[in-house]
A protein has these predicted regions:
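Acidic-and-aromatic substrate-binding clefts and catalytic sites of carbohydrate-active enzymes
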Residues: 5-12, 30-44, 107-115, 141-147, ...
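A general structural detector for well-ordered alpha-helical segments in enzyme core domains, enriched
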Residues: 15-19, 41-48, 85-92, 117-124, ...
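Active-site acidic/histidine proton-transfer and metal-coordination neighborhood
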Residues: 13-14, 68-163, 173
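Short acidic/polar active-site loop segments enriched in Thr and Asp
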Residues: 25, 55, 98-99, 190, ...
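N-terminal pre-domain/capping segments
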Residues: 1-94, 129, 160-163, 187
């Protein structure tokens, strides 16, 4: 599939329409602001998806930058408030038919014990499950999750509730191997953001860099065949 973020800064509804009329059958929706979570707006997006027979697998929130403060500070009331706000995303996802919620989490500079991190993540995970949705941790280079060792600790603490989004460009930025991440986390990886990279940059169109995408897909098929890309 293709993310609406690929067409940023086009308005979300225009991005969805453009992808649909160009034959993209599967998309990820990147919400850019609060008004795009209103029921009438989301319902209109859902109508476009239905009209063109497009499925929406995942949703990416616009509030990632707030997650360190709202989920991982010492001020616990923030957690209750942010979980209540995130229900707006989950309600929107139910209308859209989306199943995966992409989570960035804490900044690596604001280190907290992994056990506490997992405790807070679990609150999000369980809230999402009330809506039939899976919250998945993305390997963002500037965040705690940019480290494969940290993600391994999440698996150790959370077991089957540790789900991940692998972003290949973020792995490059964190000096991690996408292949190693897949080999290590296996079917805990439920979604992949894939792009090419090489001398011209770390986020290129597929075919414009030197990344062995064929090998990545082979490993993905071996380790997590139900994963979406």
């Amino acid at each position: 599939g293709v993310s609406t973020a690929c067409l940023y800064p086009r308005l979300l509804e225009e991005s969805v329409y453009d992808l649909a009329v160009n034959g993209i059958n599967h998309i990820e929706i990147f919400v850019n602001t609060d008004s795009e979570l209103k029921k009438t707006y989301v319902s209109n997006i859902a109508d476009t998806l239905k009209r063109f027979e497009v499925s929406c697998r995942s949703l990416h929130p616009y509030t990632c930058a707030m997650e360190p403060m709202m989920f991982f500070s010492a001020y616990e009331r923030r957690i209750a408030d942010v979980l209540e706000y995130y229900k707006k995303y989950f309600n929107a996802m139910n209308i859209l038919g989306a199943e995966l919620f992409v989570f960035h989490g804490n900044k690596s500079l604001l280190q907290i014990p992994c056990e506490l991190y997992c405790e807070r993540f679990l609150k999000l995970y369980e809230t999402a499950r009330e809506f039939g949705i899976t919250a998945a941790q993305e390997n963002v280079s500037r965040c705690s999750s940019g480290s494969l060792s940290f993600m391994k600790e999440m698996v150790r603490n959370l077991g089957d509730k540790a789900k991940f989004v692998l972003d290949t460009k973020q792995a490059v930025r964190a000096n991690e191997s996408s292949f190693d991440i897949l080999r290590t986390l296996k079917n805990h990886v439920v979604h992949v953001h894939i792009s090419d990279h090489g001398e011209m940059g770390d986020c290129l169109q597929i075919g414009k860099g030197r990344f062995n995408i064929k090998r990545l897909l082979e490993i993905l098929w071996e380790e997590s065949p139900d994963c979406s890309v």
